[in-house]
Amino acid sequence: MDAGARYMRLTGKENWVEVTMDGEKERKREGFTAGQQGKYNPQVSKNIGNRNTNDCFAYKGIFLWRISLTMWILLGINMCVSAEDYITLISDPYGFSPIKNVSGVPVTCVTKEFAKWGCQPLGAYPDPEIEYRNVSQEVVKEVYQENWPWNTYHWPLWQMENVRYWLKENMQENQQRKNNTKEGIEELLAGTIRGRFCVPYPFALLKCTKWCWYTAAINNESGKAGKIKINCTEARAVSCTEDMPLASIQRAYWDEKDRESMAFMNIKACDSNLRCQKRPGGCMEGYPIPVGAEIIPESMKYLRGAKSQYGGIKDKNGELKLPLTLRVWVKLANVSEWVNGTPPDWQDRINGSKGINGTLWGELNSMHHLGFALSQNGKWCNYTGEIKLGQETFQYHYKPNWNCTGNWTQYPVWQVIRNLDMVEHMTGECVQRPQRHNITVGNGTITGNCSTTNWDGCNCSRSGNYLYNSSEGGLLLILCRQNSTLTRILGTNTNWTTMWGIYKNCSGCENATLDNTGEGTLGGVANKNCSLPHKNESNKWTCAPRQRDGKTDSLYIAGGKKFWTRIKAQFSCESNIGQLDGMLHQQILLQKYQVIKVRAYTYGVIEMPENYAKTRIINRKKRELSHKRKKRGVGLVIMLVIMAIVAAAGASLGVANAIQQSYTKAAVQTLANATAAQQDVLEATYAMVQHVAKGVRILEARVARVEAITDRIMLYQELDCWHYHQYCITSTKTEVAKYINWTRFKDNCTWQQWERGLQGYDTNLTILLKESAAMTQLAEEQARRIPEVWESLKDVFDWSGWFSWLKYIPIIVVGLLGCILIRAVICVCQPLVEIYRTLSTPTYQRVTVIMETRADVAGENQDFGDGLEESDNSETSERVTVQKAWSRAWELWQNSPWKEPWKRGLLRLLVLPLTMGIWINGWLGEHHKNKKRKGGLETWHKKGTDIGLGQIPVDHLWCYKKSKSL
């Protein structure tokens, strides 16, 4: 084999040889054409040699590129956000729902000696200071809309009714006592029996721990704040209230244990930029009982009485029969500046009046406290022989064990303020209202932009009560004190022209004016009968006050709709100290609580992205990879084949799973509805049990009464005083009433009413049970449908055929893997076969040898031989042995153009077969060469005989060209 050809095939480089003799130049001069360079044309083209000749890898790369593109498209489609419904146990958005009608909420008290007072033991409910759950500000704002409402709780009313009923039942027995009080009653009446109010699950109490007030619904005509709302910013859920007296009769001051709770009720304004904040007294502080609140509801109207005993807490008629028409503030009184039990400047009041600094005070000389009259300075206390409870007064012997001569100003005291003008956002000060004849026209004394909603833009230069045209239309009454201090602005929509026309129609006022004559401190008109017009009792316009028995009626003025009416209230505020009993004390303290119904969890349907969890796993795996690795195409093909098989086998299973999941979600949702219906049944059953227990307690009380009467009759019979006297005196005591008073169920005190109520509960419970049973049955049916759907789906798709086909999957997989393995082996062995063919195939090359000979002068006829003898002899002497063949094969492997390690490793395996091939080819080539030599000699001799060597300048010979490497 030609080594030069082998080298060119392995390296792609050209290897050619030009053999030229010395006589070539002379031949050119004689016109001979020079010999052309013998340029070698390789058997394999350069274009193919410059690239990979393995077609297998090229086609495989194209195939894998197309599959990768398809997979990326499918992956992009799957990465789109798509949601899937999940039915799960989710938390309620708020966790609770507010209860507006608190009268139907079951409640019990917790205290010591619970059996004695009809309460539960202290451990029955958790301590609210330890067990509570904070509620976020966003949830409280969303539920209550920054409006913490007023609630008239029935629990304090029930307690007051119990004490009231006991007093009436034992009145005759109490009259027989002179110097002692019935055992245990003294503590109850004095409010020393303390406890908590608790509600059972699923109810709870939402306790506000931080709040403030703000104004709403401001009237542009009068400037009044129609509503003052309370914004609770922090709250917590508890089961019980704080510790408070269970009951108490009317009292002036309370225990130190209640100071903190009472101080919390002094609510401050939310806005620090209100005008009242800049005034000396600041803004109003306290709890605002709203307009329209009912202190005693209609269901307990028998407790209202005739006249209100709570001071400023009253309706427009001074009673409690109607809702409140004015806002009432209740706060912990600040008595630090009081002197001898009286407010500041009390000694400067006029003619012994009860009004000072714009406030009309209630009774301060002798305050009622637990049946005693207390002096202002605490130097004396007198027993009145009667106690006040609610709106009633009882003649009851009561001897407390406290020192009534102490200074009561050291203890916490409730102060009630009834605000008539309701302009708390403008000023917290109260004023004395002017009479109508003191209202004049302010000629140049008022400047600025004045209105009922803008007091800061108005200025006055002289004390008085001046009419002024509002910048928004209508009339204003501006009260100016101390020549520059604006204390009040009252307004009306009636303009000056309308008012002046009414004024001129008054009798004797045709030529009168409202100019200030300067009489008195604040001035006034010249003729009192021509004062600012108003409507009298007959709803007719008049300018003169009413005259009776030589006395002139005092006419005052107010803002808004009452600007033209007859007003008798001289002061804008009414205030009193004390005069509250345990019921109202509890009612005020309970306003920091709202009754809620807890619903911690419920069933619901939520939407979650389908690839949510998968995306997180993929992202986590990508982060864990520090280097990108090159994936093998064979592995990807295997993965795609397996995925295709699994997809084909699981396509129908996916359809079945989707349908099954749909029915499952519907079944679970129906089950959730059935659970809610069963919850309603439990609540109705609980209410019915309460009703039954109520009847049992009523029956217990009646049986106890009958037993007491029977006991008394038997006692009379034993004493032999039957029918002889109308009364019987005995030293034997019969203790009765060791039971709880249940008369708060007055509307159901008869058996007929109780049975009607029980029948109503039974009907409601029956309906709820039917609904619950229907919902439960529907849930069971939908749950049973799930396997039926599965069976029907198998029948439609002929699952037996699909599953019988699955048994061929292993054979198919093994066959595919075998084909892939065989193809890979072929692709690896193909270049080895090509290399071996290149190295083992002999290649022949035609070489033209140009030889220039001289003329034979000495001996033409001499025979020097054929010129090949020496060469042939040398050729014959060089035999190809196995060692030479191994050396040549190893040298070829060392000089191979492939430098990559894996290619050189593959070529190393070809050294042994190449050695055998060289040795065999050498042995066969020697035999072939001997045959060619014999034939060449015969031809040479023949040509030499016919033509003659001297006549042939150039001889053409065939020979083997041997490379230096061989």
Swiss-Prot record:
Domain of life according to the entry: Viruses
Extracellular face residues: 84-801
Role played: The surface protein (SU) attaches the virus to the host cell by binding to its receptor. This interaction triggers the refolding of the transmembrane protein (TM) and is thought to activate its fusogenic potential by unmasking its fusion peptide. Fusion occurs at the host cell plasma membrane.
Signal peptide positions on this chain: 1-83
Region entry Fusion peptide, spans: 633-653
Cellular component GO terms held in the UniProt record: host cell plasma membrane; membrane; viral envelope; virion membrane
Subunit relationships: The mature envelope protein (Env) consists of a trimer of SU-TM heterodimers attached by noncovalent interactions or by a labile interchain disulfide bond.
4Fe-4S keyword on record: no
Keywords: Cleavage on pair of basic residues, Coiled coil, Disulfide bond, Glycoprotein, Host cell membrane, Host membrane, Host-virus interaction, Membrane, Signal, Transmembrane, Transmembrane helix, Viral attachment to host cell, Viral envelope protein, Virion, Virus entry into host cell
Coiled coil stretches, renumbered: 665-715, 756-791
Region entry Immunosuppression, spans: 699-715
The record's account of how the chain is modified after translation: Specific enzymatic cleavages in vivo yield mature proteins. Envelope glycoproteins are synthesized as an inactive precursor that is N-glycosylated and processed likely by host cell furin or by a furin-like protease in the Golgi to yield the mature SU and TM proteins. The cleavage site between SU and TM requires the minimal sequence [KR]-X-[KR]-R.
Glycosylation sites: 101, 134, 179, 220, 231, 334, 351, 357, 382, 403, 407, 438, 443, 449, 459, 469, 483, 495, 505, 511, 529, 536
Organism whose genome encodes this protein: Caprine arthritis encephalitis virus (strain Cork)
Residues that span the membrane, as ranges: 802-822
BP terms from Gene Ontology: symbiont entry into host cell; virion attachment to host cell
Listed SUPFAM superfamilies: Virus ectodomain (SSF58069)
Site (Cleavage): 632-633
Gene3D superfamilies hit by this protein: ATP synthase delta/epsilon subunit, C-terminal domain
Protein name as catalogued: Envelope glycoprotein
Record topological domains on the Cytoplasmic side: 823-966
Gene this chain is encoded by: env
